[in-house]
Amino acid sequence: KKNIHSAYAEATYQFTPRWIVNLGMKYDKVDIEVDYNVNRGGSKGNNTIQKDYFLPSLNLKYNLNDKNSLRLGASKTYTLPQAKEISPYRYVGVNFNSQGNPNLKPSDHYNLDLKWDFNPTPTELISLTAFYKLIKNPISRIEVASAGGYLSYENIADKATVAGVEVEIRKNLFVRPVSNAAHGMNKLSLGLNGSYIY
């Protein structure tokens, strides 16, 4: 059983023609219950996750000129374990076997990103983003030392960090008006996206 009830509020304000700020707050009430009955060991039980999440977000935009802008974003998010990750079933897969961990905890994420956007035209884009993420109780799949050899899931540390850069390009190869103006334009666009994460 998985129930998540959410509420969200946001406000946007333009201080000047160049500065825009957006504030948001999301509330999630999480209620997860997993019942299990492991035949091999005769183990029956259930596992529950009941949490209240308050998830703020902040986005600032500064327009350098008509074609260039800077954006700064900060937010909090989370990751919940899947049902198979928190129940002690043994899963037999094609490439590996795995078993859940009833003691697994959700992960909290604190996100920060800085983005530069350049719009040569209203429908074209070149952007560069630098991002950083702090993860509390990160979840990872690990190998368990045993005769059978299987994988399980653990909160592998108190915290972990992820950082990187991302480049996005969206370019119109051609734009041609159609004979009937009501149908807009025929166009062919090329999109490229690449990331470096460390």
PLM regions and their residue ranges:
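Extracellular loop and loop/strand-boundary signature of outer-membrane beta-barrel proteins
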Residues: 1, 39-47, 97-102, 150-157
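Residues on the lipid-exposed face of transmembrane beta-strands in outer-membrane beta-barrel proteins
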Residues: 7-13, 58-62, 114-118, 130, ...
